[in-house]
Regions:
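N-terminal segments that cap or nucleate solenoid repeat domains
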Residues: 1-41, 263, 285, 403, ...
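Concave beta-strand-loop units of leucine-rich repeat
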Residues: 14-25, 36-48, 59-71, 83-95, ...
Length: 649
């Protein structure tokens, strides 16, 4: 049998190759592979010793063990201590009550998609899990199991073919994301029950619903996603009253003018991935005020539809359009608000001149080439300019010089950057973001570091010497393309005098200690896991600390971060335990928990005693919890602006 030996593991870390063909692993090899700082795919393994499981649990990324068809209780206990945020055990066809109890302690996303049935004891155990739980192998739920799993606090995903009224009533008590993507039918009573669910609700498999069922679901208070092929005027009128942050209605084959008029009255973001719609429907939708996305299915528009949509006031997204006539470009240039035409792959000089007159944020994300003349035209645009697709070809030095004259936020996606282009872009006045496909030369880094203001460099590698150059930059610096940091880079950038932002998803103790020496704002918003040691190190950082990528925070981690002197942002947390709320309430700076959606009465009472300013997201918490938190003397409710929901945890 093919076995991962110590030698094979060492070679894998050195040069990386496909190790999915191996069915066994030595304990010593597991210790080595645990150090791998990327998702670890070991789906070929058919068996795993307890010692190997304990070793692999130290891995801080995704761990894929979907080749395992069974799991001993001790191995389950070991894997539950996995330090990464995703554990995939899709091959398991059965699970003992003790193994379920053990895995429930795992705080990250847990995939148990191979389970086709679940007894009530196992369901009760898994209900105590606090991350995202995928049980897509279950095609049906008994009423008892549904009642047990409804107590789960976090995302739930089932591939249920049917749902009884009683089971729907039980699941409605669940708090968090509830995703039922293959459910094809839903009774009016079941819809009435699910409308009471607190959290995001995705029903992507339902192609038809009665008007009564739609009316019930429209009363749902969270984000709602439906995939209806037809929508009556009455149903549209009901959905227009939906008060959640986002409403998605996809797959409607022929949206009538009346239905469009009704939907346009909705106050809030509206996502309508439509394949086609009439000119009259376009005219009606244009009256919607706010975020309007017509998705990627709309690949062409009539002149009348363009004229109508151009009058829309608010954010407009049409990323299915791959080309536009000159008249269409001129019309969209008059649009008032953010405009995303991310499907366009090319742009003539004439079209660039027209779009440059648009006032507001302009995104042409899929543009793969840009002439110097077109760049010169776009540089006259007043507002944020996003050109992220220029990674297929090199941006000429002339085009870089032209774009550098743009006044406002400039976001470019490039394959590389010459020293001359870097020198030109360094003169840009305004926030500058560069997504670099490959690494930069020292000369280019030294040149771009002279940019005055906010600088974002999204590239995947940086050595100590490059970090020394960047440390001389004056202004906030974002390096969100770096998924890992060496101790040398961390120590070099710790000398940086402005705000720092990194895209790392995990940190070693030593790197955390290095970053903690930085004096200024520190953002680690993609950090998905936090050990107690790292939390203790970061707590010593002097300046505001942002950890918005953390979806789960242990009580010990919360206790450590509570000692941080400065503002603390944990906007990714949807759930907070009573103990976690109690220790965070002792934090002496401002505390931001805008994503918090699940909190007990006791936890709310604890947070209400927090002395600094407390930021919470509007519409996230129940009315009862809001009343308890109202006792906080410096409570600030924030209108949460998030990207459109994908409903894929």
């Amino acid at each position: 049998m093919k076995c991962i030996t110590k030698e094979i593991a060492e070679r894998f870390l050195a040069e990386e190759f496909d190790i999915r063909k191996y069915v066994q692993i030595e304990d010593a090899a597991a210790e080595i592979l645990a150090k791998y700082q990327w998702p670890l795919n070991l789906r070929g393994l058919t068996s795993l010793s307890e010692k190997a499981a304990k070793a692999l649990a130290k891995n801080q990324w995704l761990l894929d063990l979907c080749g395992l068809t069974s799991l001993s209780d001790n191995v389950a206990k070991a894997l539950a201590k996995h330090q990464g945020m995703t554990l995939i055990l899709e091959g398991l066809t059965s699970l003992s009550d003790q193994a379920a109890k053990a895995l429930a302690r795992y705080p990250g996303s847990l995939f148990l998609c191979g389970l086709s049935s679940l007894n009530d004891q196992a369901a009760k155990a898994l209900a105590k899990h606090r991350g995202e739980l995928f049980l897509t192998g279950l095609r049906s739920l008994s009423d008892q199991v549904a009642e047990s799993l409804a107590k789960h606090r976090g995302g739930l995903c089932f591939y249920l073919a049917s749902l009884s009224d009683r089971a729907a009533k039980a699941l409605a008590k669940h708090q968090g994301i509830l995703n039922l993507p293959v459910l094809t039918s839903l009774s009016d009573q079941a819809a009435k029950a699910l409308a009471k669910h607190q959290g995001s609700l995705a029903l992507g498999g339902l192609t038809s619903l009665s008007d009564k069922a739609v009316e019930f679901l429209a009363k749902h208070q969270g984000e709602l996603s439906l995939s209806l092929t037809s929508l009556s005027e009455k149903a549209a009128e009901a959905l227009a009253k939906h008060q959640g942050l986002y409403l998605t209605v996809s797959c409607v084959e022929n949206l009538s003018e009346k239905a469009a008029e009704a939907l346009a009255k909705r106050q809030g973001s509206l996502l309508l991935p439509l394949a086609r719609f009439s000119d009259k429907a376009a005219k009606a939708l244009a009256k919607h005020q706010g975020f309007l996305s017509l998705g990627s299915f709309v690949t062409s528009l009539s002149n009348n539809a363009v004229t109508a949509l151009a009058k829309h006031q608010g954010s407009l997204t049409l990323y299915g359009l791959t080309s536009l006539s000159n008249n269409a470009v001129k019309a969209f240039a008059k649009h008032q608000g953010s405009l995303r035409l991310d499907g366009l792959t090319s742009l003539s000089e004439k079209a660039a001149e027209a779009l440059a007159k648009h006032q507001g944020s302009l995104s042409l994300w899929d543009l793969t080439s840009l002439s110097a003349k077109a760049a010169e035209a776009l540089a006259k645009h007043q507002g944020s300019l996003h050109l992220g697709g220029l990674t297929q070809t090199s941006l000429s030095d002339q085009a870089a010089e032209a774009l550098a004259k743009h006044q406002g936020e400039l976001h470019l996606g490039l394959s590389n950057l010459s020293e001359k282009a870097a020198e030109a872009l360094a003169k840009h006045e305004g926030p500058l973001s560069l997504d670099i496909k490959y690494s930069l030369s020292y000369a280019a880094i030294e040149a771009i570091a002279k940019h005055e203001g906010v600088l974002s460099l999204d590239f995947c590698s940086l050595d100590d010497a490059g970090a020394e150059y960047l440390a001389k930059h004056e202004g906030d610096l974002s390096l969100n393309g770096l998924y890992s940091l060496s101790e040398g880079v961390a120590n070099a950038l710790a000398k940086y005098k402005g705000g720092l932002s990194f895209g790392v998803t995990n940190l070693s103790d030593k790197v955390a200690e290095g970053l903690a020496k930085h004096e200024g704002d520190l953002s680690l918003n993609r950090l998905c896991g936090l050990s107690e040691e790292v939390a203790n190190a970061l707590a010593k950082h002097e300046g505001d600390l942002s950890l918005n990528g953390l979806a789960i925070l242990s009580d010990k981690g919360a206790g450590a971060l509570a000692k941080h002197e400065g503002d603390l942002s944990l906007n990714g947390l949807a759930i907070l335990s009573d103990k976690g709320a109690g220790v965070l309430a002792k934090h002496e700076g401002d505390l931001s928990l805008n994503g918090l959606a699940i909190l007990s009465d006791k936890g709310a009472g604890a947070l209400a005693k927090h002395q600094g300013q407390l930021h919470l997201g509007c519409g996230k918490l129940s009315e009862k919890i809001v009343q308890i938190l109202a006792k906080h003397k410096r409570l600030h409710w924030t209108k949460v602006t998030l990207p459109p929901p994908s409903f894929v945890f």
